[in-house]
Amino acid sequence: MTEPAIQIEGLRFAWNGAKPVLDVPAFTLARGERLFLRGPSGSGKSTLLGVIAGVLVADAGRVSVLGQELGGLSSAARDRMRADHLGVIFQMFNLVPYLSVVGNVTLPLKFSDRRRRIVGGDADAEARRLLGRLGLTDEALLARRVSDLSVGQQQRVAAARALIGGPEIVIADEPTSALDSD
């Protein structure tokens, strides 16, 4: 049997010791499977994604991502796992304001040999290809700092950054919230 992409058992998480916002008895997501989380604001969706991404640490339970039990990893090891295996689109895009559009998209490759090898020799060309698939093709725009872009354009840059290097799991927290319907 193939190891699941994500496996959760007895997960509990609370902010600063308050009432738990997450209480997940059991959950498994198979490799290749897609999942859409739906719920009202404040229901814990972003918190759950943060725990799965290893940005937040569960108070109790077991969270495994691609066979790695996150609770047993140091902060640096969780960062390495995330850099090598996860593409993440955060609600607050976390783009580096002084980098160009292409520089922001290729940034994950500076932290992951694995993703850099997958992209191969021309990271800028791969960034442009991904940006083009997301509707950003103007070369002058791609050379600009991301802080000069519209919020919708910034969200497209964040999506391309999450996808570069073919991560095994993409975690997207409201990835289309700033995009127009086209």
Regions found by a protein language model. Give the residues of each.
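Conserved ABC transporter NBD signature motif
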Residues: G61-E69
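Conserved catalytic motifs of ABC-family nucleotide-binding domains
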Residues: G166
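ABC ATPase NBD coupling module
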Residues: L70-G87
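Catalytic Walker B motif of ABC-type/P-loop ATPase nucleotide-binding domains
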Residues: V170-D173
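Short coil-to-helix segment of the ABC ATPase nucleotide-binding domain corresponding to the Q-loop/switch region
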Residues: L99-P108
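Helix-to-loop junction immediately C-terminal to a conserved catalytic motif
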Residues: A53
